[in-house]
């Protein structure tokens, strides 16, 4: 099993690489790439951790050497949010970065499962799909927008609010990965009920949690460590699916034939081909149905931005 992390010298990439070095199955290969010259050194640093995961680092303009033979590619490359920015402000820089990297993925490891972390995810995933279509290698079951951070935040905040063991909290988060497009389905959480006020405030906190971190870091960065953990959870689920483990389910932003938009975050069953099955997200409350329907114009606009960027 070979996993490649593109953007491995950044805050998310280093956290993700550390977690993968400690969690990937014995005998796996972990390949780190970043434009920054420090990247081979990050790999040397991590190589001193005593786990049976072989690690190599690559720097420079071309990620191809890192991608050869990759089964899973996780892309966190790009610029981070600063105070006063929202995820869409990142588009002007990150769109080009994702396009260029995906062109190399399409040429080097077109069958790999690709997880896009780089924001704005609503748009960068659409860019990746269009690039792969142009290259003639697009497989909608192998491309994912990583929305796991919205899920782990939801699990954490619900457990805190209700005094639950966080390991027992399961929730679907649907829609997209920014602002109003993030929709935690609180009505489905087993064993708890929420007042209307709690639903409104908790939904808003989950939607704005990224901004909470950006502001708390006071210009010193965005959510890198929690995102690294979320990306590792999702990446490990991709690996477990590839290894044939049963019932591996995660929410992800995918081209899953949703009635709502071309790309939509919902639960998917993972397996040897990436997505084995897109799962229904179940019954929703009136509040959730309204929130879902009112986000769609925003979500579709984000997607169109990505499609138009490549065309």
Curated annotation (Swiss-Prot):
UniProt-listed GO biological process terms: malate metabolic process; tricarboxylic acid cycle
Pfam families for this protein: Ldh_1_C (PF02866), Ldh_1_N (PF00056)
Keyword Oxidoreductase annotated: yes
Record: active site: 177 (proton acceptor)
Stored InterPro entries: L-lactate/malate_DH (IPR001557), Lactate/malate_DH_C (IPR022383), Lactate/malate_DH_N (IPR001236), Lactate_DH/Glyco_Ohase_4_C (IPR015955), Malate_DH_AS (IPR001252), Malate_DH_type1 (IPR010097), Malate_DH_type1_bac (IPR023958), NAD(P)-bd_dom_sf (IPR036291)
Listed GO MF terms: L-malate dehydrogenase (NAD+) activity
Gene3D superfamilies xrefs: Lactate dehydrogenase/glycoside hydrolase, family 4, C-terminal, NAD(P)-binding Rossmann-like Domain
GO cellular component, one term: cytoplasm
Annotated NAD(+) binding sites: 7-13, 34, 94, 117-119, 227
EC number, as in UniProt: 1.1.1.37
Keywords assigned by UniProt, alphabetized: NAD, Oxidoreductase, Tricarboxylic acid cycle
Assembly and oligomerization: Homodimer.
Role: Catalyzes the reversible oxidation of malate to oxaloacetate.
Family listed: Belongs to the LDH/MDH superfamily. MDH type 1 family.
NCBIfam families, sorted: MDH_euk_gproteo (TIGR01772)
Protein name: Malate dehydrogenase
Native organism: Shewanella sp. (strain W3-18-1)
């Amino acid at each position: 099993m070979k996993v490649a992390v593109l953007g491995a010298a950044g805050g998310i990439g280093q956290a993700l690489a550390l977690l993968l070095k400690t969690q990937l199955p014995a005998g796996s290969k972990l390949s780190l790439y970043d434009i920054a010259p420090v990247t081979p050194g990050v790999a040397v640093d991590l190589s001193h951790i005593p786990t049976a995961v072989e690690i190599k680092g690559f720097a420079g303009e071309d990620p191809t050497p890192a991608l050869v033979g990759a089964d899973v590619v996780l892309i966190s490359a790009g610029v981070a949010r600063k105070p006063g920015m929202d995820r869409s402000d990142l588009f002007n820089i990150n769109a080009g970065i994702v396009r260029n990297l995906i062109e190399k993925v399409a040429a080097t490891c077109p069958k790999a499962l690709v997880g896009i972390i780089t924001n704005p995810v609503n748009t960068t995933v659409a860019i990746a799909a269009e690039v792969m279509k142009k290259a003639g290698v697009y497989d909608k079951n192998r491309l994912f927008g990583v929305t796991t951070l919205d899920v782990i935040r939801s699990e954490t905040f619900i457990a805190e609010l209700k005094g639950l063991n966080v390991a027992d909290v399961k929730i679907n988060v649907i829609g997209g990965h920014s602002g109003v497009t993030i929709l935690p389905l609180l009505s489905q959480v087993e064993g708890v009920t929420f007042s209307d006020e709690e639903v409104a405030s908790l939904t808003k906190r989950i939607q704005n949690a990224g901004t909470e971190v950006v502001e708390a870091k006071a210009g010193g960065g965005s959510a890198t460590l929690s995102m690294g953990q979320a990306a590792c959870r999702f990446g490990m689920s991709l690996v477990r699916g590839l290894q044939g483990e049963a019932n591996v389910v995660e929410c992800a932003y995918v081209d899953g034939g949703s009635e709502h938009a071309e790309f939509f975050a919902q639960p998917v069953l993972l397996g040897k081909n990436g997505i084995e099955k897109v799962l229904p997200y179940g019954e929703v409350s009136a509040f959730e149905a309204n929130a879902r329907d009112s986000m769609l114009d925003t979500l579709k606009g984000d997607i169109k931005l990505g499609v138009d960027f490549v065309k």
